[in-house]
A protein has these predicted regions:
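A domain-level signal for the structural core that forms small-molecule/cofactor-binding pockets
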Residues: 1-108
Length: 108
């Protein structure tokens, strides 16, 4: 963790180059702002059949840490929001979900 998953309207999916740039932005934000180890960062892009709402939904799952205060998470979300607009031209709904170690069961 963190895992950053983007569900993007299939009809408005950005070009591969734009997604690669956004992926690099996400890795940078996760390692610098959230202080995650590079090996623990995952970024995934999913094509979605859009129903209603923003054309992008960003779902961030992360491990709760004392360094990830509300102010840090707000800074992360603001920077992520700007990166999404800069790389895709689309508006995103961003949601972050923190998990404590006792509530997280994982492999690999």
């Amino acid at each position: 963790m963190p895992n950053v998953t983007f569900s993007i309207d299939a009809n408005r999916m950005p070009a591969d180059d734009s997604l690669a740039e956004l992926s690099r932005d996400c890795v940078e934000l996760c390692t610098q702002v959230l202080e995650a180890a590079l090996k623990n960062v995952h970024v995934i892009f999913l094509e979605a059949r859009h129903g209603h709402g923003h054309p992008v939904f960003a779902d961030i799952r992360y491990r709760v840490a004392t360094s990830r205060t509300p102010a840090v998470m707000n800074r992360f979300m603001e920077a992520l929001d700007h990166a999404i607009v800069r790389r895709t031209g689309l508006t995103a709904r961003i949601r972050c979900f923190g998990y404590t170690t006792s509530n997280l069961h994982a492999r690999n």
